Regions:
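Transmembrane alpha-helices of multi-pass small-molecule transport proteins
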Residues: 1-33, 112-116, 135-150, 225
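Helix-helix packing/entry segments at the starts of transmembrane helices
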Residues: 50-56, 123-138, 174-206
Length: 238
């Protein structure tokens, strides 16, 4: 029993005195801000617009990887990123003030998602997967409770079904996304991943009665086109 306690104590000390704890903390903060801004964006703009804006994480990740991780980026990617932000401008062009606020939240979410991707990319080269997952879960849960504890309601009886449905769909999405990369080529996954914009548009139209004007639709198509090729060139370079 004493021997077991000593081993457990040593393990706990090793975990919580992790020398990459600052990066784990930064990653958790990125995740919290991304999640909060993502939900705020969904409460203001349409489902299809929010899904499309989410793909701008490809632009931000390419830029951050060049600046922080010193990864090389070719001129084609730079031109595509600039062209992609033209699509965002077109989406914002006809927007009223509230919708513009939603686009800002969506872009902020995409930026912090990119920060999370960069931090995970760094951590995977320095720390093991179990530590990365554990620290993210523990730190995120603690910070969310600390920041939002006054607004947290544990009375979930009215929304229990929707919360369970949201949890199941999120877990299913993560599972099938992981399996798709295991069983198929990345180039094909890139193409198929854009189907979420189609699903978001259709579901938003059928269930939420959402509508998209022609200028916004053009902006969406530009973002789809540019992020597709940024991803494609990145995969080919790797």
């Amino acid at each position: 029993m004493i021997f077991f306690s000593m081993i457990l104590k040593k393990k706990i000390k090793k975990i919580f005195f992790n020398k990459y704890i600052k990066i784990h903390l930064i990653r958790a903060i990125f995740g919290i801000v991304a999640m909060y801004c993502g939900y705020k964006a969904l409460s203001i703009i349409s489902l299809s617009l929010a899904s499309t804006i989410g793909f701008t994480k490809v632009f931000f990740t390419s830029l951050l990887a060049t600046i922080i991780l010193k990864e090389s980026v070719n001129y084609k990617n730079i031109l595509l990123i600039v062209f992609g932000f033209l699509g965002i401008y077109l989406i914002a062009l006809p927007s009223a003030a509230p919708q513009l606020e939603g686009l800002v939240f969506g872009l902020t979410s995409a930026l912090f998602v990119s920060g999370g991707i960069i931090s995970v990319s760094y951590l995977t080269k320095k720390d093991n997967t179990v530590n990365i997952l554990m620290f993210h879960s523990v730190i995120s849960s603690f910070l969310v409770f600390l920041i939002f504890y006054k607004g947290i309601s544990f009375d979930i009886s009215d929304n229990f079904f929707y919360l369970i449905l949201m949890t199941l769909t999120a877990l299913s999405g993560q599972y099938f996304n992981t399996e798709s990369y295991r069983n198929e080529k990345a180039n094909i996954i890139i193409v198929v991943s854009y189907s979420r914009i189609i699903f978001s548009t259709v579901l938003g139209f059928l269930i939420l009665d959402e509508k998209i004007d022609l200028v916004s639709l053009l902006g969406i198509m530009i973002i789809i086109f540019t992020t597709f090729f940024v991803k494609k060139y990145s995969v080919n370079n790797n």
